[in-house]
Regions:
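Extracellular/periplasmic carbohydrate-active domains that bind, remodel
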Residues: 1-457
Length: 457
């Protein structure tokens, strides 16, 4: 396999001038030879966007610090790509559209104009420091102390009038390996993969910024031994099939996981709040514009939920979400244990409902709000809580532990609760309920005739 050093293509360390051109030359040289490794030697490098291509490995030596430009206009180099030109129909200037402004959706629409900003690969919103389109066998491998830094790039034309480019955007790629580096302070999501297949992410550390890793309509995803300290959701996405997440630390100021999939195993993970870095949406416009660090003082950093269901109309969901097992995990200081709310008032939970989810061997501390298990009438939920050790905050004393509606079955097999709750289950519909091995919690199941409401997150 061909190996080249990017310095031989003009890469200069520790200067203010943008260096993405030299890195791209090295990538394109290897691509023309059928693939290879592009080595980035120790040093600080400022850059706009670079495009990985099939059979290319980007290797970051120890001490590499790739710093994204603070100018969001520096991330459009892909539009002038002459090696693999992007077809005009895949390029759009469509602006970001807040999903909460789109009403009346009942089914997925492939060509809905409001979602062009997300679904087409060459949009402003999809910009990133590192991107790949229609590529296979691509890798980003970092040695210890290699860093990719988004410098909190501010874009007044971006999402919510401030979010800048992602750290990485991979669109319709196969056989993706991400390993070893630290990625921090990205203008938007650190990793954004859509329509990808066979993904492994190992020993990656994500700090500050927004979401840590977003997988949408992907197949065969493995995330192992990664560390997330994020201002937004640690791991997010939906429409995925076959997912394994193991041995990760997820520290968030939003949800540890805002996620859904068909066939998913999440095991041996710690989901810990409050966030080490604040949710940047709580910062002032002046702080955002200056690219200020994600400080905690005066900004929100509580973890809203350990697991929040996710399924909106922006991307396809090819299979019914379900068969999700979360096992041998710890939830610490998450306000909510589970937040599944298909009642209709949740912007990001409206497309395909969840069929089944099980929590097994979970220790949860300082839960502050009820478990929401509100399914769909046409696809009632199967919920299993098995061998759960949970402590709840004082404010739960007048609240029910579980809120349930449109459920096929609720099986509780081993539940120890430290602290007081009003009732075990409050239900808005009927279904099969099995209760065994309760300790420290009443076995009462009550019915509520008032309309169900849960605050969206």
């Amino acid at each position: 396999m061909l190996t080249v050093n990017a310095k031989d293509f003009g890469l200069i360390p520790n200067v203010e001038e943008l260096q993405h051109g030299a890195i791209q030359k090295a990538i394109d040289h290897c691509f023309a030879q059928g693939g290879g490794d592009v080595v980035i030697p120790k040093g600080v490098y400022h850059l706009g966007d670079i495009r990985l291509r099939s059979h290319i490995t980007l290797r970051l030596e120890s001490g590499v610090h790739l710093m994204g430009s603070r100018n969001p206009e520096d991330y459009f180099n892909h539009r002038g790509d002459k090696v693999e030109p992007i077809a005009p129909e895949r390029i759009t200037d469509a602006p970001y559209v807040g999903l909460w402004t789109i009403h009346g959706e009942t089914e997925y629409e492939e060509n809905k104009p409001e979602y062009r900003f997300r679904r087409l690969p060459a949009s402003r919103w999809n910009n990133a420091i590192i991107r790949a389109i229609d590529a296979e066998d691509i890798k980003v491998i970092g040695e210890r102390d290699s860093v990719i830094d988004g410098v909190n790039c501010f874009d007044p034309q971006g999402e919510e009038d401030y979010r800048g480019p992602h750290g990485m955007t991979f669109y319709n790629c196969k056989n993706v390996e991400l390993k070893g580096y630290t990625i921090q302070q990205t203008g938007n999501w650190a990793h954004w993969l859509l329509f990808c297949e066979n993904i492994t992410m190992t020993d990656v550390q994500t700090l500050a910024g927004h979401d840590g890793a977003d997988f949408f309509s992907c197949r065969n995803v493995a995330v192992e031994n990664c560390v997330f300290h994020t201002g937004d959701d640690c791991i997010a996405g939906f429409g995925n099939i076959n997912v394994h997440i193991s041995g990760c630390l997820l520290n968030s100021s939003c949800s540890a996981m805002r996620f859904s999939a068909t066939n998913a195993l999440i095991e041996h993970c710690r989901m810990v709040g409050p966030g080490q870095y604040c949710f940047r949406g709580s910062m002032s416009k002046e702080e955002k514009a200056a690219g200020a660090p994600s400080a905690l003082i005066g900004h929100r950093n509580n973890m809203l939920s350990a697991f929040t269901y996710y399924a909106d109309f922006s991307m396809p969901i090819p299979a019914l979400p379900g068969n999700i097992l979360i096992a041998d995990c710890e939830f610490e200081n998450a306000d909510r244990f589970l937040h599944y709310n298909f009642s209709g008032n949740e912007t990001w939970q409206r497309y395909r409902p969840l069929d089944s989810i099980e929590f097994r061997n979970i220790k949860a501390t300082n839960v502050a709000m009820p478990i929401n298990a509100y399914g769909a009438e046409e696809v009632p939920l199967s919920l299993v809580l098995r061998n759960i050790d949970m402590s709840v905050k004082e404010e739960m004393a007048d609240k029910n532990l579980i809120h349930a509606c449109h459920y096929r079955s609720i099986v509780v097999d081993g539940l120890k609760v430290r602290g007081k709750v009003k009732n075990l289950i409050c239900k808005w519909s009927d279904g099969y309920i099995s209760l065994r091995g309760l300790e420290g919690v009443p076995d009462t199941v009550v019915t509520d005739n008032k309309p169900f409401f849960a605050q969206g997150i």
